[in-house]
């Protein structure tokens, strides 16, 4: 890891080249970052050429994995795009400078606001409802404000990738992986011996296609983990754009309804808070997508997206990397090959099926609770999955069509299995 003065020196040089004068960054503070990223806050020495008093500097060291490293370009483009938006639609900080060769981003400092995770942990039931209502409004404003701007985002992405060999293909592959995870999750559940009703299977298949090509698309960071959402001055700001792009907006809604998959919820499913969240979101987007005002349509779309998140969460259980899974998964392998990513030929003599990797496999984690004991890690993972399936069951139970009853029973049975 580069030492702190070097990272900050690079950032100061970037700002100097862009804004003029001689920029100086002092009082450097290390912040929490995702993965191996280095994140710092620094105070800007007073300078007439640059009005910001402090900045956040993020460096994402190259890992050597081309799929992982492609996230930096996506994040840079997403910040470029977000910065170009009007303040009412802008989801988070503005981009102040960047250097793709040194993998450094400089963004505006939001200050010392609290994360959504902290807010939810401290909330009583009434406050919980109010927080989700505000979150629904913030998401809706972002979705409504960016629904017609997809071409602008794509232009920025094309500019960033066209001079970099195979970069565009890697970005397309990263998008495809999101829908592959839904399919892989279905396979993992079946491999664990759980029957999947036709209603669930059809919804999973449909939502797989809709994620990237649905008619209700808008810009989203996609990673809405509560640690990546900051509240300042009663407004929510979304951080971490490594998976940002144009996706079906109901996936964002479902992520919150599901109580943030891959994040242990502070509270049980709260029907009142969920309704307040969805209603606030609908009020912001109904002029853009009038169909969300029809309860049956809204119920169907959110339920399907919940199924998508549940299956994706199950897929993440697998200890194999996606490259390793691609060795034995023909559909995944085809997309890797199309993107120019090398995948080793499968070991036909002893290869395990995708998703099966020995005693610690995803299938094993999904075993019935009567077949315990479970390790501490298994218990945490099972709790997170249980929360997701409980949320799916609770939301599906409100649907009027008989198919929702089938979905409810499936989700409830899986939640019980994971106790």
Locations of regions flagged by a protein language model:
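ATP/Mg2+ or Mg2+-diphosphate-binding catalytic cores
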Residues: 308-419
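Catalytic activation segment of kinase domains across protein kinase-like and atypical kinase folds
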Residues: 227-259
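Conserved NTP-binding catalytic cores of kinases and kinase-like/nucleotidyltransferase enzymes
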Residues: 1-101, 214, 232-236, 381-419
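Conserved short submotifs of the Hanks-type protein kinase catalytic core
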Residues: 102-114
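Conserved kinase catalytic-core helix
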Residues: 113-156, 204, 210
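Active-site activation/catalytic loop segments of kinase-like enzymes and analogous catalytic loops
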Residues: 251-290, 305-327
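Catalytic-loop of the protein kinase fold
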Residues: 219-221, 226
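Active-site catalytic-loop/activation-segment of kinase and kinase-like phosphoryl-transfer enzymes
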Residues: 1-8, 155-208, 285, 385-406
């Amino acid at each position: 890891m580069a030492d702190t003065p070097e990272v900050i020196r690079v950032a100061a040089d970037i700002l100097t080249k862009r804004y003029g004068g001689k920029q100086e960054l002092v009082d450097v503070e290390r912040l929490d970052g995702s993965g191996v990223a280095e994140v710092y806050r620094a105070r800007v020495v007073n300078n007439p050429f640059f009005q910001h008093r402090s900045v956040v500097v993020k460096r994402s060291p190259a890992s050597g994995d081309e799929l992982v490293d492609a996230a930096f370009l996506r994040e840079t483009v997403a910040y470029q795009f977000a910065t170009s938006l009007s303040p009412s639609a802008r989801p988070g900080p503005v981009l102040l400078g960047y250097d793709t060769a040194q993998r450094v981003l400089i963004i505006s400092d939001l200050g010392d606001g609290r994360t959504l995770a902290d807010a939810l942990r401290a909330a009583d039931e009434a406050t919980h409802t109010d927080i989700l209502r505000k979150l629904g409004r913030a998401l809706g404003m972002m979705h409504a404000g960016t629904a017609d701007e997809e071409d602008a985002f794509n232009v920025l992405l094309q500019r960033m990738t066209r001079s970099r060999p195979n970069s565009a293909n890697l970005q397309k592959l990263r998008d495809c992986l999101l829908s592959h995870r839904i399919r892989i999750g279905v396979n993992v559940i079946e491999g664990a011996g759980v029957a999947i009703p036709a209603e669930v299977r059809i919804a999973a298949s449909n939502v797989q296609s809709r994620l990237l090509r649905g008619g209700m698309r808008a810009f989203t960071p996609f990673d809405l983990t509560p640690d990546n959402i900051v509240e300042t001055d009663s407004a929510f700001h979304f951080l971490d754009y490594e998976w940002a792009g144009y996706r079906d907006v109901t996936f964002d809604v479902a992520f919150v309804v599901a109580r943030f998959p891959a994040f242990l919820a502070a509270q049980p499913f709260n029907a009142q808070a969920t309704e307040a969240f969805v209603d606030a979101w609908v009020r912001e987007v109904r002029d853009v997508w009038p169909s969300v005002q029809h309860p049956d349509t809204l119920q169907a779309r959110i339920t399907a997206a919940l199924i998508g998140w549940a299956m994706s969460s199950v897929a993440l259980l697998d200890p194999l990397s996606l490259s390793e899974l691609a060795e034995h998964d023909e559909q995944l392998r085809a997309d890797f090959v199309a993107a120019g990513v090398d995948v080793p030929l499968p070991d036909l003599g002893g290869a395990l099926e995708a998703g099966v990797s020995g005693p610690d496999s995803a299938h094993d984690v999904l075993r019935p609770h009567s077949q315990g004991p479970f390790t501490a890690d298994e218990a945490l993972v099972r709790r997170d999955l249980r929360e997701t399936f409980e949320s799916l069951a609770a939301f599906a139970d409100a649907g009027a069509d008989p198919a929702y009853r089938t979905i409810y029973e499936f989700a409830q049975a899986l939640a019980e299995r994971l106790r």
